């Protein structure tokens, strides 16, 4: 409290200047000391609340120039990279520096082994001027004068294949054999490559198709005839021909007339199928593939000519007894399917799915024999071929209705293969009697075993586990097991414990009904009847016809290894073509993990996209 100024005047105290300055300096010093003490006090108070001060840390970051990272993270990354190099990189470097041995191919299964041999049969059946690498030492050039009297074929009809144990060239079964080989290559090219037979089988196909192109004017768009056969065999004939004589092909000295067909819906259809299928096989050779397609189109047009609908074999005594065609509607369906796949032209698939075609072919009738695939009945093969289109591409309208019918019929055909349903008889040894106990049963066995294995692979490729036979569900494995059982029978799993493929296994036929195999290759040219002693001898063949599948046993599993029992002991082109197809379908060679059972796409390489064309724009609106 301030006291009152009882004396009057100012409250200020007067002082001299020097004293004033000293006082001010002392006040500044006191403030500085007080401030210092206050700062120390603040730090002390903070220490009470926060604890003792931390020691000053080292710099935690590293400047790499382009980026700044934590020192700890940088060390962690470096150590991780070093560990990865030691664990992964170093072993890889060491492994690559070690010289590698070529990996051993997996051991071939029995089907692969038999396949190598079965293909050699075609080398032995070649006619014409043989290549140096043909591989059959006891075969030479033959048939070099075939068709030499024809004025419209330059060089004659030289080449092709002899049909069986005689020296006739039947063009109908020859064409079917080439179709079968081509189909097997299209579906299973990876397997052929894996077993080293891809180039070989293509060469065999080309040998056949080159010859087929000679049998008509393949450079023309319209033709009026085809040559259907070279060589003849008259029933009970007494004049030299291909049955009366017993000669090696190289020693033939008798007439070999050429048969001509001005009407051939069946033969023309099969030839078109063979050339069209081969054009897909040789799609990597554009010029040759185009040549095949053009030839196929010409002979297909000839086959479909409305004024040429008489079967090629009718009334011809040199054909009708051996390869008589019972219908041509199956060849129409078969060839149309192949022409569509080869060209992508919708005209062919439109015809193949026209409801009138299966009606005329009786494709949807419940006729048991129509379910058996053979050189004479293409219906089961054509139906499966068209089912392929539905299963993989599903084109829908307007083809769907007929394709469903073909697919359902294919499934029913497969049902007939199982003994439990009693459609066909089976021998006690397990062989299906597709031709009802007649001669040459094995050619039917292998053809239908191929279809069974192929259909199983189709279903597996689209993740379908099986299908219904009435109330019974049959699996893909059931179907494949049937095919295996039939082929295994042929390879030796039968009551006779013998292989029906020459050269396969330890026990196989050694007295074939085959002129070339039975007549020694000893430099002697035997006459027409001079070869009879080799026909009639009971000795084994001097030339082993490796890979030849014989006709097969009778309905009681019995087999007579005698040269004159041609129904059992004669091999044929169609038989071996079916055998090759069945073997490549069943072998596991070339099927690695993740590899589909069949080549799904090559067949469709010419087929356009399956979607409708863009509709035309609407017309202009007018009020």
From Swiss-Prot:
Residues forming the catalytic site: 166 (nucleophile), 513, 561, 570
SUPFAM superfamilies listed in its UniProt record: Six-hairpin glycosidases
Residue spans, topological domain Cytoplasmic: 1-73
Membership in a protein family: Belongs to the glycosyl hydrolase 9 (cellulase E) family.
Residues carrying sugar: 217, 236, 324, 345, 408, 425
Name of this protein: Endoglucanase 12
GO process terms (BP): cell wall organization; cellulose catabolic process
A GO molecular-function annotation: cellulase activity
Domain of life: Eukaryota
Organism of derivation: Oryza sativa subsp. japonica
Sorted UniProt keywords: Carbohydrate metabolism, Cell wall biogenesis/degradation, Cellulose degradation, Glycoprotein, Glycosidase, Hydrolase, Membrane, Polysaccharide degradation, Signal-anchor, Transmembrane, Transmembrane helix
EC id: 3.2.1.4
Enzyme class: hydrolase
Catalytic activity: Endohydrolysis of (1->4)-beta-D-glucosidic linkages in cellulose, lichenin and cereal beta-D-glucans
Gene3D superfamilies: 1.50.10.10
Protein topology in the membrane: Single-pass type II membrane protein
Main subcellular location: membrane
Cited InterPro entries: 6-hairpin_glycosidase_sf, 6hp_glycosidase-like_sf, Glyco_hydro_9, Glyco_hydro_9_Asp/Glu_AS, Glyco_hydro_9_His_AS
Segments crossing the lipid bilayer: 74-94
GO cellular component, one term: membrane
Extracellular compartment segments: 95-623
Record localization: Membrane
Pfam family, one: Glyco_hydro_9
Tissue expression pattern: Ubiquitous.
């Amino acid at each position: 409290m301030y006291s009152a100024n009882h004396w009057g005047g100012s409250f200020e105290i007067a002082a001299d200047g020097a004293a004033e300055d000293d006082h001010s300096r002392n006040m500044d010093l006191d403030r500085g000391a007080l401030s210092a003490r206050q700062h120390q006090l603040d730090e002390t108070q903070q220490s009470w609340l926060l604890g003792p001060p931390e020691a000053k840390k080292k710099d935690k970051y590293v400047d790499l120039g382009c980026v700044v990272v934590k020192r700890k993270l940088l060390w962690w990354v470096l150590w991780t990279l070093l560990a990865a190099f030691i664990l992964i990189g170093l072993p890889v470097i060491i492994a690559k520096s070690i010289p590698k041995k070529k990996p051993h191919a997996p051991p071939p299964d029995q089907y692969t082994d038999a396949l190598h041999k079965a293909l050699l049969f075609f080398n032995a059946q070649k006619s014409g001027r043989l290549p140096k690498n043909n591989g059959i030492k006891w075969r030479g050039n033959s048939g070099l004068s075939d068709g030499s009297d024809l004025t419209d074929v330059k060089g004659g009809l030289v080449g092709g294949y002899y049909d069986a144990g005689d020296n006739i060239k039947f063009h109908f079964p020859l064409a079917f054999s080439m179709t079968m080989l081509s189909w097997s290559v299209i579906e299973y090219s990876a397997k052929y490559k894996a077993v080293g037979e891809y180039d070989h089988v293509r060469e065999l196909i080309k040998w056949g198709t080159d010859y087929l192109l000679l049998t008509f004017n393949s450079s023309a768009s319209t033709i009026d005839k085809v040559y259907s056969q070279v060589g003849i065999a008259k029933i009970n004939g007494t004049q030299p021909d291909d049955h009366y004589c017993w000669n090696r092909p190289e020693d033939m000295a008798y007439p070999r007339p050429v048969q001509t067909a001005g009407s051939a819906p069946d033969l023309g259809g099969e030839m078109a199928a063979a050339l069209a299928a081969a054009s897909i096989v040789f799609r990597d050779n554009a010029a040759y593939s185009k040549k095949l397609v053009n030839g196929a189109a010409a002979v297909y047009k000839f086959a479909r000519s409305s004024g040429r609908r008489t079967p090629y074999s009718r009334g011809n005594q040199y054909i009708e007894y051996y390869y008589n065609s019972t219908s041509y509607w199956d060849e129409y369906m078969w060839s149309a399917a192949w022409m569509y796949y080869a060209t992508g032209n919708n005209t062919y698939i439109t015809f193949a799915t026209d409801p009138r075609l299966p009606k005329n072919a009786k494709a949807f009738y419940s006729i048991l024999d129509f379910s058996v695939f053979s050189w004479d009945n293409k219906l089961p093969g054509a139906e499966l071929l068209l089912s392929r289109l539905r299963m993989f591409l599903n084109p829908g309208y307007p083809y769907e209705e007929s394709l469903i019918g073909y697919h359902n019929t294919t499934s029913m055909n497969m049902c007939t293969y199982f003994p439990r349903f009693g459609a066909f008889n089976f021998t006690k040894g397990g062989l299906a009697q597709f031709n009802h106990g007649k001669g040459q049963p094995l050619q039917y066995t292998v053809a239908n075993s191929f279809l069974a294995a192929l259909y199983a692979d189709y279903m597996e490729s689209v993740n379908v586990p099986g299908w219904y036979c009435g109330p019974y569900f049959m699996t893909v494995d059931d179907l494949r097991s049937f095919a295996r059982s039939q082929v295994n029978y042929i390879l030796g799993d039968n009551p006779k414990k013998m292989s029906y493929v020459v050269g396969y296994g330890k026990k196989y036929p050694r007295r074939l009904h085959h002129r070339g195999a039975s007549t020694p290759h000893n430099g002697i040219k035997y006459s027409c009847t001079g070869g009879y002693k080799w026909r009639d001898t009971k000795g084994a063949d001097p030339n082993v016809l490796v890979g030849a599948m014989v006709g097969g046993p009778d309905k009681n599993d019995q087999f007579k290894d005698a040269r004159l029992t041609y129904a059992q002991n004669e091999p044929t082109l169609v038989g071996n073509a079916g055998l090759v197809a069945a073997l490549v379908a069943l072998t596991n060679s070339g099927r690695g993990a993740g590899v589909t059972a069949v080549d799904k796409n090559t067949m469709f390489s010419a087929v356009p996209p399956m979607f409708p064309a863009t509709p035309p724009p609407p017309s202009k609106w007018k009020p």
